[in-house]
Amino acid sequence: MHITYDLPVAIDDIIEAKQRLAGRIYKTGMPRSNYFSERCKGEIFLKFENMQRTGSFKIRGAFNKLSSLTDAEKRKGVVACSAGNHAQGVSLSCAMLGIDGKVVMPKGAPKSKVAATCDYSAEVVLHGDNFNDTIAKVSEIVEMEGRIFIPPYDDPKVIAGQGTIGLEIMEDLYDVDNVIVPIGGGGLIAGIAVAIKSINPTIRVIGVQSENVHGMAASFHSGEITTHRTTGTLADGCDVSRPGNLTYEIVRELVDDIVLVSEDEIRNSMIALIQRNKVVTEGAGALACAALLSGKLDQYIQNRKTVSIISGGNIDLSRVSQITGFVDA
């Protein structure tokens, strides 16, 4: 028996998304980490979405959204904007579904992510220097070509797709006490929160953002949507200064807490994952583990079972070298 909330996404939407995704994506592993368990004085399990197709969780929401389009909408083609992971998720989903896709990426997007997006099938348009520039170009393409826009996070189908991670967690570790989730625009934590809380509302869902960019945390703690960004962050995949309207509504209702981590804590988390768990992750993917190592979650995690979401692993090797100190930054 599931609990139903009056929110834009329900548990039934996530179950439908799981059915659409069956055979199309991986059910990612979630092993117990001895290192993190010993450090945190609890049982810590790592959910490896960095091992997902395209290297991040984003394909879940992208595929669910695209497969939900009508035949007429699919024939129009789609357009998305992203600096990396959403772009790759949309591009591969288009290839699997036979949809013509176009992705607008900022000129400064990592070359490896641009190349991967092209390889998966979509036409890449490099435009502008930031999200505002790319979204303006997307609006132009929608108007000129009639394509369907695929949002990166603030969409019910996208949120439901990301929520399938929550279902997998409950299948593999039904007695989990806490789920720790990175936050950018909020699609991932919103979907996971709906899935988890609909099955067992006593499980804590806790978000993590960078001190440098934390629009969702600022909104969550102030009680209204607001913007926060001081400078860039190693967690560039979560460099979103303002949360979505839908994601904020869900987070405000269902998420238990949001904590902030420093750039040094993110860096140390990435290094720990490489050295101790042999896992390469991007900065955004290391946010949840950064919070675990920081001590800021000790009140929740000690002597309890906790899942930490490793949301993505798309990072250039040169960046890994800089972070681990093999070459100068």
Swiss-Prot record:
This is L-threonine dehydratase catabolic TdcB. Induction: In the absence of glucose and oxygen. Belongs to the serine/threonine dehydratase family. Its cofactor is pyridoxal 5'-phosphate. One of its GO terms (molecular function) is threonine aldolase activity. AMP binds at residues 53-54, 88, 119-120, 314. One of its GO terms (cellular component) is cytosol. Each protein molecule can bind up to four molecules of AMP, which act as an allosteric activator to the enzyme. The enzyme is also inhibited by alpha-keto acids and other catabolites. GO terms for biological process: L-serine catabolic process; L-threonine catabolic process to propionate; threonine catabolic process. The keyword NAD does not apply. The gene is tdcB. It comes from Escherichia coli (strain K12). It catalyses: L-threonine = 2-oxobutanoate + NH4(+); L-serine = pyruvate + NH4(+). Coiled coil: none annotated. The modification N6-(pyridoxal phosphate)lysine is found at residue 58. Catalyzes the anaerobic formation of alpha-ketobutyrate and ammonia from threonine in a two-step reaction. The first step involved a dehydration of threonine and a production of enamine intermediates (aminocrotonate), which tautomerizes to its imine form (iminobutyrate). Both intermediates are unstable and short-lived. The second step is the nonenzymatic hydrolysis of the enamine/imine intermediates to form 2-ketobutyrate and free ammonia. In the low water environment of the cell, the second step is accelerated by RidA.
